[in-house]
Structure formats: structure tokens, C-alpha cells
Amino acid sequence: IRRADPTVLAAVFAVAVCWLSAWGLALWTVLSGLGSSIRAHVAILVFAAATFANNVTPFGQAGGEPVAALFISRSAGTEYETGLAAIASVDSINFVPSIGLASVGIVYFSTQVSFGSRLQFASYAVAALAIAVPVLAVVGWNYRYRVEAAAVRVATPVASLVGRVVPRRSPPTADAIRSRVEGFFHAIERVSGNRRGLALTFGFALLGWLCLATSLWLSLFALGQTVAYPVALVVVPVGAIAGATPLPGGLGGVEAVLITLLVALGVPNGAAAAAVIIHRTATYVLPTVVGGGIAGVLGSDTFAAGS
């Protein structure tokens, strides 16, 4: 790492900022489609806070979305369920381009190198996701009203229990819970029905993934490792799957997968580890630190009183 080119290192962090901005603009597009008047730069800051929540809670987005929804509702002036629908929509749309990019990389390498066991596993994972994600999306959408009813049945006793345990909070009624769950699904329907907004959000999501791949590629280049760009297109999306591990932000799991795949693709062990450290410092540590400060402001009583 000490031998890394400082100019290229600066470019890594600049690209990381571009990634965060692109996905923040994706959030802005979704919120605008839901009737929020939030400004683009504010949405980027809010997304940084949401990224902090994802990075410090287990299971990545699944653990951070409820907290991120609170930040969104406070800053965008929306109901909590609308904020939850917005961040859930953004995270779902963000996931789609990763499958396509990883598929492009896998196809490229199938014509260039023979697959070892690790590359075969990566290709199987990408293929499984390419099939499973569209199928689950179609099934979930076709049966969304049943899913909504099931969500109400599950949420009602849980919310009632929390309401009894938390001091100075009365348990919500079943009608209030049903209204909020319906509001969440109604917001999801509004997002899915806005084709122009979906296309724009998808474009920002794709740009963000390209920035992430570029960050890893530049991290390798800073260490004197010149690799084909499709290497990053394969490694970054597959590594993101490790973000679902029960560790904050997938910490440890993501790094292990990234290093393993880079080594399988011919990068020396030491260079792979150093490049991943640089890449994750720019795309994990930096947004966690910056997003944590923003989250502190959004969560403060002063902000709540002024909003």
C-alpha cells in the first residue's frame, strides 16, 4: 500500500464520491416520483446516512433500511412507510444492474480463461441470481395483495408488543398498522408505475456500479497491477452478495470474497489484499464516517424541531 500511486489513490476516492452521488440521485429520483420536493444534494447526503445505517447493521440493506427510512422521512418530509418504500425501491433497483454487469464479465472470461472451481462458483452464483431475482420479483408483484395481508398479520402483534415495552408509547391499533402497510405498498406501486422515473433510477444505479468497479480497478492500478476491466465487473457485484452476511455491512465477508476472486483471476495475493483494502476504505470506511456524521444530524432533536 505504501508504494501506491498517490494520484491514482486520489482518483479512487473521487470515483467513490461519484458512486455515492449516483445512488443518492437514484434516491432523489424515486422520492421525486413519490411527490417529495427534496433537493438533489440533500438526497445525496441522506443516502450517505442510509449507507452508514447499512454499514453498521447486520445483513446489509435488510438491517439498515428501517433506520434509513427514518432518515428519509425526516429530511424529505414524508411518512415513514413512504421513506421505507423509497429506500427499498432504490436498493432493489440498484441490485439489478449488478447481475447484468457480472454476466458480461463472466461471458468475457469464458472466452479468455479456463474456469477454476472458484470462478465456476462465481458464475453459478451470477446465473442463479439472474434467474431468481426476476422470478421472485414477478411472483411478489402478482401476489402483492397477499403479501400485504401477510405483512399486516405479522406486523400487528410485533408492533403491539413493542408498543407495550417501550416507555411512553401506546401500542398502535390494528387499523393504524394496516394503514401504514397499505401506504408502503401503495408507494411501491407508484414507483413501479413511473416508467420514466424507473429508467432514470436504473441509469443512476448502473452508473454507481460502474463507479464501484472502477474504484477496484484503480485500486489495482495504483499498485502497478494492470488487469482487464471485466475483472472488476465480475468481482465487485459477486462480492456485494457477501453484504448479506450477519456482519455489519458484510464486513470481513465482502473482503474475503473480493480477494478470493481476484486471486482466482490471476492477481497476486499481496496485491489483491492491498487493492481490496484501498477499495473498501474508499467505498466502506469513507461513506460510513461521512454518513455517520450526517446521520447524527438527521437524528438530532434540533433537526427534528427545525424540519
Which positions does each model-derived feature cover?
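Conserved mid-sequence domains
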Residues: 229, 233-244, 252, 264-267, ...
